[in-house]
Amino acid sequence: MLPATLLRXSGLGRVVRQARAYXEAAAAPXSAAGPGXMSFTFASPTQVFFNGANVRQVDVPTQTGAFGILASHVPTLQVL
């Protein structure tokens, strides 16, 4: 475990608290979409392509390749 002064000085304490919140959210009961499924909405400023579709995984192309998003997975930030 890291010393508390290091966590405060480097801002890592905030990151650790956020990670704990994500872990607790992932452990929460599954939504109405069913186990292993999630509600998916995809829209542009002018058009809705999917609205509340029940899906198991969303594959997303990025500038560096592609990745899959699963229900209750850790949050990520990527340029699309």
From Swiss-Prot:
- What InterPro entries does the annotation carry? ATP_synth_F1_dsu/esu, ATP_synth_F1_dsu/esu_N, ATPsynth_dsu/esu_N
Q: Name one GO biological process term.
A: aerobic respiration
- One Pfam family this sequence matches: ATP-synt_DE_N
Arranged from A to Z, the UniProt key words for this protein are:
ATP synthesis, CF(1), Hydrogen ion transport, Ion transport, Membrane, Mitochondrion, Mitochondrion inner membrane, Transit peptide, Transport
Q: Where in the cell is it found?
A: Mitochondrion; Mitochondrion inner membrane
**One Gene Ontology term, aspect cellular component:** mitochondrial inner membrane
Question: Transit peptide range?
Answer: 1-22
Where this protein primarily resides, as one coarse class?
mitochondrion
GO molecular function (one): proton-transporting ATP synthase activity, rotational mechanism
State the family named in the UniProt similarity comment for this chain: Belongs to the ATPase epsilon chain family.
The role this protein plays is: Subunit delta, of the mitochondrial membrane ATP synthase complex (F(1)F(0) ATP synthase or Complex V) that produces ATP from ADP in the presence of a proton gradient across the membrane which is generated by electron transport complexes of the respiratory chain. ATP synthase complex consist of a soluble F(1) head domain - the catalytic core - and a membrane F(1) domain - the membrane proton channel. These two domains are linked by a central stalk rotating inside the F(1) region and a stationary peripheral stalk.
Listed under subunit, the entry gives: Component of the ATP synthase complex composed at least of ATP5F1A/subunit alpha, ATP5F1B/subunit beta, ATP5MC1/subunit c (homooctomer), MT-ATP6/subunit a, MT-ATP8/subunit 8, ATP5ME/subunit e, ATP5MF/subunit f, ATP5MG/subunit g, ATP5MK/subunit k, ATP5MJ/subunit j, ATP5F1C/subunit gamma, ATP5F1D/subunit delta, ATP5F1E/subunit epsilon, ATP5PF/subunit F6, ATP5PB/subunit b, ATP5PD/subunit d, ATP5PO/subunit OSCP.
> What protein is this chain from?
ATP synthase F(1) complex subunit delta, mitochondrial
Organism from which the protein derives: Sus scrofa
